[in-house]
Amino acid sequence: MLSGSETSSLNTGNRIGIFGGSFDPVHTGHVLVSVYTLEILDLDRLIVVPVFNPPHKKTVAPFEKRFEWLKKVFEGMEKMEVSDYEKRRGGVSYSIFTIEYFSEIYKTKPFFIVGEDALSYFEKWYRYRDILKKSTLVVYPRYCGKPYHEHARRVLGDLSEIVFLDMPIVQISSTEIRERARLGKTLKGFVPEEIRKEVEVFYGG
């Protein structure tokens, strides 16, 4: 079953990107990745998909709160969409199901955006080879990427089909933001201003 935003978007072009994650919370690095991804890949639409029930870790903020923050941050941005698909689907949130879902809706092979650190354990992802077949993997830089690239090359082999984004390195992490908030430090510059105060209070406890 399609959401309202998905139904209204079916007449868009076929260059579709999927940007999944816990977004616990969404931060300025996520916004940077979105802007560069839209521009570099010339996407018709970038769909941000917060995880509902992650297979390997638990989130701190509930889905509804993370989804609300994402809507506040991205709703006014052109070609951006925030989807609650993984909550509507229910069960464990495996990326391959999300890829297959949007691939069927838009009748295209989508771009699937992940951080560079994901390359260090990508072979542990559920049906990871299907992810590589059914989407074009797009990797944005985080920290020092060389060890991740070497590991991915050993495990995955040819990386020529993977798109590595040429953009500033994303140094910030949601874990760091939660810790700063816990210590009562400002999150100015770390999270978008639209949600900063709310995020500081929520994780400040």
Swiss-Prot record:
Q: Which pathway or pathways does this protein act in?
A: Cofactor biosynthesis; NAD(+) biosynthesis; deamido-NAD(+) from nicotinate D-ribonucleotide: step 1/1
Q: Name one Pfam family in it.
A: CTP_transf_like
Taxonomically, the superkingdom here is Bacteria
Q: Which reaction does it catalyse?
A: nicotinate beta-D-ribonucleotide + ATP + H(+) = deamido-NAD(+) + diphosphate
Q: Which residues form a coiled coil?
A: none
InterPro entries named among the record's database cross-references: Cyt_trans-like, NadD/NMNAT, Rossmann-like_a/b/a_fold
**Molecular-function GO terms, alphabetical:** ATP binding; nicotinate-nucleotide adenylyltransferase activity
Q: Which residues span the membrane?
A: none
| NAD listed as a keyword | yes
What EC number(s) does the entry state?
2.7.7.18
BP-aspect Gene Ontology terms: NAD biosynthetic process
Which keywords annotate this record? ATP-binding, NAD, Nucleotide-binding, Nucleotidyltransferase, Pyridine nucleotide biosynthesis, Transferase
- Give the matching NCBIfam families: cyt_tran_rel, nicotinate (nicotinamide) nucleotide adenylyltransferase
Q: What function does this protein fulfil?
A: Catalyzes the reversible adenylation of nicotinate mononucleotide (NaMN) to nicotinic acid adenine dinucleotide (NaAD).
What does the similarity note say?
Belongs to the NadD family.
- The protein depicted here goes by the name Probable nicotinate-nucleotide adenylyltransferase
Q: What is the gene called? A: nadD
